[in-house]
Every structure is written in C-alpha cells, then in structure tokens.
Amino acid sequence: MTVLKMTDLDLQGKRVLIREDLNVPVKDGVVASDARILAALPTIKLALEKGAAVMVCSHLGRPTEGEFSAENSLKPVADYLSKALGRDVPLVADYLDGVSVQAGELVLFENVRFNKGEKKNADELAQKYAALCDVFVMDAFGTAHRAEGSTHGVAKFAKVAAAGPLLAAELDALGKALKAPAKPMAAIVAGSKVSTKLDVLNSLSSVCDQLIVGGGIANTFLAAAGHPVGKSLYEPDLVDTAKAIAAKVSVPLPVDVVVAKEFAETAEATVKAIADVAADDMILDIGPQTAANFAELLKSSKTILWNGPVGVFEFDQFGNGTKVLAKAIADSAAFSIAGGGDTLAAIDKYGVSKEISYISTGGGAFLEFVEGKVLPAVAILEERAKA
C-alpha cells in the first residue's frame, strides 16, 4: 500500500488541512470520552512543530446537512484542544471562502456536515476545501470507508494529499495482521448476528487458524453443531452458513456457558454444560472451562485479531468470559490488534489497553478493511501517490 505520508513532507510555512475523526460523545457541552481526540493530538502537534499553518476538520454526529445545530457543534472539542495544548484554538464557522491562519497557528473548523454536499462528496465543496490548503492530510481512519467531501473529494483536488501518522499506523497494523500474519493466527469475532459479520467471518476463515466466535454469533454456530441454545438470540436461517464456515477453518465451540432466564442487569447467572441448556435459558456468556480453553489457544498464537466481547460484559455476572480472554490477549506475546466500539469498551473495563499491540480507532472502517473491502479515502491517496 503506497501512499504519501505527512511525516515525509516539508510543511514549513505550508497551509495544512488535517481531516481527523473527532466525532466524540458530548454531554452537557463537555467532551464525555476523549479517546479519539487523544489519538489525533500527536498528528496535530507534529504539524505545528513542522512549522505549518494548521487547520483541522471533522464531523460530529448526524446533523441535517446545510444547517447549524448547537448539539453537533465542535465547540466542546475546540475547548478541549485549547486546554490540552495550552493555547487558544479558535473554532471557525465560516471557512469555505478562505481563512486567515499563520505558520505555527492552529484553528478548528466547524462540523463539516454542516456544509451542503459533504455526505454526497460534491466536487464543488471538495474544491473549496482543497483551495484552503497547500497540503491535505487524511488522518481519520474511522471515516476512511466513507467517500465524503472532507475524506475523499478534497484528496482528489488538493495540491498534495497525504496520509497522517494515525491513518498510516492503522494501515500498517492491519496489514501486519491480515496480509502476512505471523502464524498461528487466532481471531475472535463476536456480536449479536452472523448476518452483520458474515463478510468478516468469511474473510478471516481464509487467513486464521482458529476462529473463536462469541455472542449471538456463537449461538448460531452451536445450533449448527446440533447443540441446544434455548431461547438465546440466534439465526436459524444462517445455520448452513455457519456449517460452511466451520468446514473451512477450526471454530472451537463452548463446552460450558453462563445462562439466565431473562436478559437483565439483575438476572441470576448459572453455569451449565452446553448439553444441559434448557428451553427457557438464554446464553449470555461463555463458561469458565470454555474461557480457559480459549485462553490456552490464544497463548500459543502469534497473531490475534479481536472484534467483539464474547458475553454481555456490561452486566458483571456475564463478563467473566470477556475478562479472561482480554487478560489472555494482554499476557500473550502475539501481535494483537483490537477494534470495534464494544471491544474498546471491554478493553477499558478490564484495563488492558497498554498490553494490546494495536487498538484500532475505526469501527466500520476496521470491519470493512478486515472484510477485504477497498476504503475510498485510502484508495484516493494511493491514486494521488502514483500520479
């Protein structure tokens, strides 16, 4: 994958527009989770150190295009950046017809989704973005799977279009895990439905040695193997699909599970052997023996890809499976990469972020890359690098 990298460019005195993913949760006008901002800070600091006039843009939420809405304003992000960098970071609302920024200065543009034509990737808007800068830097891996004005269109028209350090690191880590992984490789794919992760499961079945499934996905595989799943969430119409995947790659199944009679925070958890699951049971986690078996598989792996918690870890009585696997990944010497919103929440809960080799900032983009799909914002950077 050949793209021009921001780190290789001379940015002294250049006007640099950086597209970051600053789509963070905001509560009562204050940033509630700063993970994405923290991930973007090194790129912004580097551009300033290189003597650039820095303009940063991002989306936040899903406002009605062409209309300002206070709840989707990036004002809380500008406030956060000002504190984090110890300098004034002005939020600029009207920037499409030009903005004054000097070398060593930093401004944040208001939500790009307030601009008409952003989501449709309109050329007219993309050309206005491009006219603002000497160098466009795409650093938002989380939106790289969307062809929009500020992620794809601008890269077509900017004088120079490059990948930022965060985007480059994501691509390197994912390439390492998927293109030529150190073997044996284990993947953990969990979620409520096989249908939403079908492409991921198919793609991984051809590169990994062990495909560990969890959540509703595991229930469909259990049903495919003839095991009782009670009233658990599963997809009867995808049982044959599960059988086909299990014929291609080793899919270790739970030998014991944690069940309850209802899906609730107060539900009583009971450990049962898989054969003993009753008709009115709901499977809400893997059992302790299964967790130990899976942890053993992870211990002998050289590459681990993790997408999705294996139980309803938000309720502590159904969190042990995810906790044991999180610790096993943390203790492993393997190259490990984790991605997806729920996965990141589990990593936070069990305090293993420092032990995982690479944590992806992109949810949908992470999955699409794993599926083997082309990410439009990356493809345009490759095209520009060739030219």
Curated annotation (Swiss-Prot):
Pfam families under this entry? Answer: PGK
Q: What Gene3D superfamilies does this protein map onto? A: Phosphoglycerate kinase, N-terminal domain
Chain positions recorded as ATP binding sites: K197, E314, G340, G341, D342, T343
Uppermost EC category: transferase
Chain residues that bind substrate: D21, L22, N23, R36, H59, L60, G61, R62, R113, R146
EC code: 2.7.2.3
Keywords, comma-separated and alphabetical: ATP-binding, Cytoplasm, Glycolysis, Kinase, Nucleotide-binding, Transferase
Q: Which GO cellular component term is one of those annotated?
A: cytosol
InterPro entries assigned: Phosphoglycerate_kinase, Phosphoglycerate_kinase_CS, Phosphoglycerate_kinase_N, Phosphoglycerate_kinase_sf
Q: Which family does it belong to?
A: Belongs to the phosphoglycerate kinase family.
Subunit composition? Monomer.
Q: What is this protein called?
A: Phosphoglycerate kinase
Q: Which organism is it from?
A: Pseudomonas putida (strain GB-1)
